[in-house]
């Protein structure tokens, strides 16, 4: 969490290797492997996933074809149609997503909530080691937020990690975070649990700045 301009989205971009961001110092390690020099696609194959704030629309490409192609690209393994289709339907039902969405063109005509649910479906299919959700709750009403983040909670396991970037405390109604980090001026200034979120909701980020002399 952090105020506008704190560097939250920049952190996400650095982790996935977005070309508009440059890492000037330090190391990025994934399972003890330094990945500083890896390109975006190479990091994706290593297991890093980024959910976009504003997912792209691609006419002519169905959700199912997109996901099957992405799975093949990430794993390097052929995904046979019927087996993949059956697995996809099972995942969609688990996430309370209408299986008919699989035949729709990617994000075309989707509501904001449907686009975000589709991002979570991508997570379920690709099974990343590190999933970064950059303000996935942005623009969602409470009902859509509930559906999306209950889906996120279902995908959390002991074998993966999730970095959830948000401005708002409402997502924590549906998630149980291991840690809450506060980012200000490009660095983590405070770490704790849900009590930090409650303090921010009550007093704002100014209280943290004051307490830490920032």
Regions found by a protein language model. Name each.
Residues 2-7:
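Walker A (P-loop) phosphate-binding loop of ABC-type ATPase nucleotide-binding domains
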Residues 16:
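Helix-to-loop junction immediately C-terminal to a conserved catalytic motif
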Residues 27-43, 107:
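ABC ATPase NBD Q-loop/coupling interface
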Residues 50, 54, 60-75, 87:
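Q-loop/switch helix immediately C-terminal to the Walker
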Residues 123-124:
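ABC ATPase C-loop
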Residues 132-136, 143:
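Walker B catalytic motif
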Residues 145-158:
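Helical segment within the ABC ATPase nucleotide-binding domain
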Residues 174, 179, 183, 187-209:
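Conserved beta-strand-loop-alpha-helix hinge in the C-terminal portion
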């Amino acid at each position: 969490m952090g105020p506008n301009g704190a560097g939250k989205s920049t952190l996400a971009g650095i982790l996935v290797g977005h070309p508009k961001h440059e890492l000037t110092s330090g190391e990025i390690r994934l399972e003890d492997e330094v990945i500083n020099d890896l390109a975006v696609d190479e990091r994706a194959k290593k297991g890093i996933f980024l959910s976009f704030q504003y997912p792209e629309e691609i006419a002519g490409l169905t959700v199912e074809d997109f996901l099957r192609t992405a799975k093949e690209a990430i794993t390097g393994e052929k995904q046979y149609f019927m087996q993949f289709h059956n697995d996809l339907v099972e995942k969609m039902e688990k996430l309370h997503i209408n299986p008919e969405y699989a035949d729709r063109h990617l994000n075309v005509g989707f509501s904001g909530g449907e686009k975000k649910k589709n991002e979570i479906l991508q997570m379920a299919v690709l099974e990343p080691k590190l999933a970064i959700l950059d303000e996935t709750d942005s623009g969602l009403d409470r009902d859509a937020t509930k559906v999306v983040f209950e889906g996120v909670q279902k995908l959390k396991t002991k074998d993966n990690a999730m970095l959830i970037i948000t401005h708002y405390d409402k997502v924590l109604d549906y998630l149980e975070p291991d840690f809450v980090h506060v980012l200000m001026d490009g660095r983590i200034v405070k770490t704790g649990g849900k009590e930090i979120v409650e303090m921010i909701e009550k007093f704002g980020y100014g209280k943290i700045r004051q307490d830490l002399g920032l």
